[in-house]
Amino acid sequence: MAAGFLKSGDLGPHPHSYGGPHPHHSVPHGPLPPGMPMPSLGPFGLPHGLEAVGFSQGMWGVNTRKQRRERTTFTRAQLDVLEALFGKTRYPDIFMREEVALKINLPESRVQVWFKNRRAKCRQQLQQQQQSNSLSSSKNASGGGSGNSCSSSSANSRSNSNNNGSSSNNNTQSSGGNNSNKSSQKQGNSQSSQQGGGSSGGNNSNNNSAAAAASAAAAVAAAQSIKTHHSSFLSAAAAAASGGTNQSANNNSNNNNQGNSTPNSSSSGGGGGSQAGGHLSAAAAAAALNVTAAHQNSSPLLPTPATSVSPVSIVCKKEHLSGGYGSSVGGGGGGGGASSGGLNLGVGVGVGVGVGVGVSQDLLRSPYDQLKDAGGDIGAGVHHHHSIYGSAAGSNPRLLQPGGNITPMDSSSSITTPSPPITPMSPQSAAAAAHAAQSAQSAHHSAAHSAAYMSNHDSYNFWHNQYQQYPNNYAQAPSYYSQMEYFSNQNQVNYNMGHSGYTASNFGLSPSPSFTGTVSAQAFSQNSLDYMSPQDKYANMV
C-alpha cells in the first residue's frame, strides 16, 4: 500500500495532476491517493516502464530524474463529453476546455491535447475519404466508361439487373444494346430494344421496381447520352424499356402490334408496350412514343398536352437530325418512324429505341426539314415523318390531317413560348392530338417525356415525333384527356420534371421561366443549344 501510495502521490516524476479519475496510467496504481475516486486494480498497481524503474531506484522518490508522463486513457464517459464538445466546435477556447476538464476530472492540458489529436484524426479521415473517392471515381471513369455510353450501359445493366429477376433477356438485351451502342449504335440498340420488348413480357412481374430502376438507369444514361450522342441513351432506353417497365398487357399488345404492323409499331409495341407498363423508364418513354406512333398501346394514361411537348420540342432541335438522335430518340420516337420508313423496321421492334437508331438520317431529319420546307404543314411533313411515326400516320390518317404547326418551324419566337394553349381542342393541336393522344394513351406520354428529357439528342427525335404527333394531339377530343388527367400520372410528370426543371404545376400549363429552364437548367444538357445546328435552333418547334 505504501509503495502504491508513494508511487502515485509522492513521486515527483509522476504528479497526479494529470490523471483525473484515472491517472495517467491505463492501469491505475495501487490504492490511489485520497482524492482519487478510482479503485486500484492491484495492491501496488502494475508497474510498467518507467514506473518500475522509479521504484527500483528508491521508495521515497530517490529518482529525481523527471519521468515521462504516462499515456492517459480516457474513459467512455470522458470521451463522450469530449466528442460532444468536438461536435460543437473543433477549436474550444481556454474557458471551454477548463469547463470540460472540470466536468470530466482531467487537467485542461489533457483536454487541449485531445482536441489537437482529434482534429488531426479528422483531417486524416477526410484525406483518406477523398483518396478513396477519387480512386473509385477514376475507376468508374475508366471502367464505367471512357465513353458515356459505357456509363449508360452500366446504368442500364443496373436497371436490367434489377429487372433481370423477371427477364434475363432484359439484361442481355439492354447490355447488348449498350455494348453495341457505340460500335453499332443503331443495330445494337434496336436489337436490345427488340429484346427488351420481347423480354418485357417476362419482365412484367418486375415492372414496377424494374421500371423505377430502368428509369434511373435511363436518366443516368440519358445524362451521359447527351454526351455520347444517343448511343448510351438508346441502350439505356432499351434497358429501361426492357427493364420490366412493360406491362404484360401492353407488352402483349405491343408485341402483337409488332407482328402485325410496321416494325415501327412492333418496335414501339415491344419496347413501348413494355414501357407503357413501366411508364417510369426513359426507354419506356421513348418506346412509348414509338408505340404511340403505332397506335398500338392501349394504355390511355397520358395524352400529352400540346404544351407539354413544347418543352421537349425546345430540346428536340438537336444537331443530330438524323442518325444520332434518330438512334436514341428515334428508338423511342423514331421507332414508329422506322417502321414506316422501313429503316429500322427490325430494330425498332424491340424498344423502339433501336428503331430510331436504324432510321435513316433523311428520315430523321425529314420531319423537321420536311415540315419546314412544306411550310409547316403537318400533313406534308407527316409522310416523311413516317420515319418517326410513319406507322402511326399510316394507320391513322388523322395524323396527316393538316393540324397546322404549333409554331411555325421557322418561327423565331423564344423557346419559352408555351406551345399552343393547352386547350384540349386547340386547332393547332388538331393533327397532333390524334397522334399524341394515342401516343400518350399508348405510350404514357410522360414516359416519352422522361425519355425526351433523359437525353437531349435522343429527345430530339422523340420530341420531333412528339412535335409531329403533337399537332394532332388535340385533334382527337376523345383521345385527349383533361390536363388534370394528363398529370394524373404524377409519377411520370414529376419524373420528367426532375430532369427538365418543370414543375407539375407549370409543366404544360404556362410559359413560365421553368420553360426556359429546360434549355439552361435541364439535367440532361447544360447547354442544349450546343447540340443544335443553326436551323435547329428554332427551339420553338412547338
UniProtKB/Swiss-Prot annotation:
Annotated GO biological processes are:
adult walking behavior; anterior head segmentation; anterior region determination; brain development; brain segmentation; central nervous system development; compound eye morphogenesis; compound eye photoreceptor development
Under the heading InterPro entries, the entry gives: HD, Homeobox_CS, Homeodomain-like_sf
PROSITE patterns the record matches:
HOMEOBOX_1 (PS00027), HOMEOBOX_2 (PS50071)
Tissue specificity, in the record's words, reads: Expressed in the anterior region of the embryo before cellularization and becomes localized to the procephalic head region following gastrulation. These cells correspond to the mesectoderm or midline neuroepithelium and will generate a mixed population of neurons and glia. Expressed in photoreceptors in pupae and adults.
The UniProt keyword set, sorted, is: Developmental protein, DNA-binding, Homeobox, Nucleus, Repeat, Transcription, Transcription regulation
Would I find DNA-binding among this entry's keywords? yes
One Pfam family per UniProt: Homeodomain
Low complexity composition bias: residue spans: 11-21, 124-141, 148-194, 243-267, 406-417, 425-441
Without the gene, what phenotype results? In embryos, formation of an abnormal neuropil and the disappearance of the horizontal commissures associated with the midline of the CNS. In pupae, misshapen, duplicated, and shortened rhabdomeres within the eye. In adults, deletion of the ocelli.
**Subcellular location(s) per record:** Nucleus
Give the span(s) annotated as Disordered: 1-40, 124-209, 243-278, 392-441
Chief location: nucleus
List the CDD domains hit by this protein, alphabetically: homeodomain (cd00086)
What is any one of the record's Gene Ontology cellular component terms?
Answer: nucleus
User: Which residues carry the record's DNA-binding region feature?
Assistant: 67-126
Q: Which domain of life is it from?
A: Eukaryota
State if Aminoacyl-tRNA synthetase is listed as a keyword: no
Domain notes per entry: Contains multiple repeats consisting of single amino acids (e.g. Gly, Ser, His, and Asn) and pairs of amino acids (e.g. Gly-Val).
Q: Which family does it belong to?
A: Belongs to the paired homeobox family.
What does the function comment of this entry state?
Transcriptional regulator involved in pattern formation and cell determination in the embryonic CNS and larval imaginal disks. Also later in development to coordinate the expression of regulatory and structural genes required for photoreceptor cell fate in the ocelli. Has a dual role in the terminal differentiation of subtypes of photoreceptors by regulating rhodopsin (rh) expression: essential for establishing the expression of rh genes in the pale subset of ommatidia as well as repressing Rh6 in outer photoreceptors.
Protein name stated in the entry: Homeotic protein ocelliless
Q: Give the organism, scientific name.
A: Drosophila melanogaster
Its organism's taxonomic lineage begins at:
Eukaryota, Metazoa, Ecdysozoa, Arthropoda, Hexapoda
